[in-house]
Amino acid sequence: MPSPRVLGLVLAGGAGRRLAPLTADRAKPAVPFGGLYRLIDFVLSNLVNAGYLRIAVLTQYKSHSLDRHITTTWRMSNLLGNYVTPVPAQQRLGPRWFAGSADAIHQSLNLVHDDNPDIVVVFGADHVYRMDPRQMVAQHLDSGAGVTVAGLRVPRAEGRSFGVIQTGRDGRIIEAFLEKPADPPGLPGSPEETFASMGNYVFSTDVLIDALRKDAADEDSRHDMGGDIIPMLVAQRAAAVYDFSDNVVPGTTARDRGYWRDVGTLDSYFDAQMDLCALDPVFNLYNREWPIFTSVPSLPPAKFVHDDPRRTGIAINSIVSNGVIVSGGTVRSAVLSPGVRINSWAEVDRAVVLDNAVVGRGAVVRDAILDKNVHVPPGAQVGVDKDRDRARGYTVSERGITVVGKGVTVTD
């Protein structure tokens, strides 16, 4: 049987308000992660590693940095018709922007018609994980379903925070799609677990087009993929679930197999990066068999100075990107993005420091996120006194992580 022709659609229009101020000037999928990456690099790497090389990224909210990242990083040879391209809202169906994730695809159906795929893979743009989507596509074709939804096994209590998939006894056909239920249903054979929707879908093309057109004609619809399109197909008994725990990615270990993180809040974003700093992190960035691709700035290697016991530049349990200079400061459990400068006697402990931020002499940064081009003057403190941080106008998360926005000079 010949391989199906697959088109990838990546939904990247989210505003990410819970990640503010990191999303004040950028779309959520463009938020930096892990030193070198953007959140969108994870889904695009999964698709490209699988050989799916015709991908449209549907953008809308403050998309300039996201569009620039895609066009400079994800350049495919077009000799064989391959592409990764950002597609902004174009008002093809009238003078309005995208009204929801389903409307974004409906307004972009010209892409589907032009490419004429057998299968349309619709994935979200802002989760951290590895997945081989070929295995999900294979199950979809074998099942004969109109749509297959990726399901993540989570404890039932955690299911209250997700869209939840209820299946029949066979564990495959979806009987109900529940939005943040108070009492999530257990799984057949595993009653203490439930299926949380990952927001990843595989559609037979004709089924997707038909569902989108019906949804567009419904004035009461929210035009949302998870809230409207999937329930419509569930009612037709045309929806199946794909168990993410069955997915085997080359190079993964038993420890990081099945890893998936929604980093949509400041605390979850921070926690996922602190995990990367651990001696044995759950998520392995160093898997060469299924790499996470990105563009790396042309900067020199990281440097640590001085050879002086009173101010030795040192980084412990940390990720240090190219262009970083740790000049006599101490860094513990931190992710330092390219071009960061840590000066003498400075202390950086449990922090995410984004591109070109500068921490001055004797300054302290603790339990904090510094966005790009932040300047912490000599002797200043961030994250030490949360009440003082709030008084200075900085965001403090529910769990006490201080966030300083892009380009801010910290006041003493």
From Swiss-Prot:
Keywords: ATP-binding, Carbohydrate metabolism, Glycogen biosynthesis, Glycogen metabolism, Nucleotide-binding, Nucleotidyltransferase, Transferase. Homotetramer. GO terms for biological process: glycogen biosynthetic process. This is Glucose-1-phosphate adenylyltransferase. Pfam families: Hexapep_GlmU, NTP_transferase. Alpha-D-glucose 1-phosphate binds at G163, E179, K180, S197. Transmembrane segments: none annotated. The gene is glgC. GO terms for molecular function: ATP binding; glucose-1-phosphate adenylyltransferase activity. It is an enzyme of class 2 (transferase). Belongs to the bacterial/plant glucose-1-phosphate adenylyltransferase family. Its EC number is 2.7.7.27. PROSITE patterns: ADP_GLC_PYROPHOSPH_2, ADP_GLC_PYROPHOSPH_3. Signal peptide: none annotated. It catalyses: alpha-D-glucose 1-phosphate + ATP + H(+) = ADP-alpha-D-glucose + diphosphate. It comes from Frankia alni (strain DSM 45986 / CECT 9034 / ACN14a). Pathway: Glycan biosynthesis; glycogen biosynthesis. Involved in the biosynthesis of ADP-glucose, a building block required for the elongation reactions to produce glycogen. Catalyzes the reaction between ATP and alpha-D-glucose 1-phosphate (G1P) to produce pyrophosphate and ADP-Glc. CDD domains: ADP_Glucose_PP, LbH_G1P_AT_C.
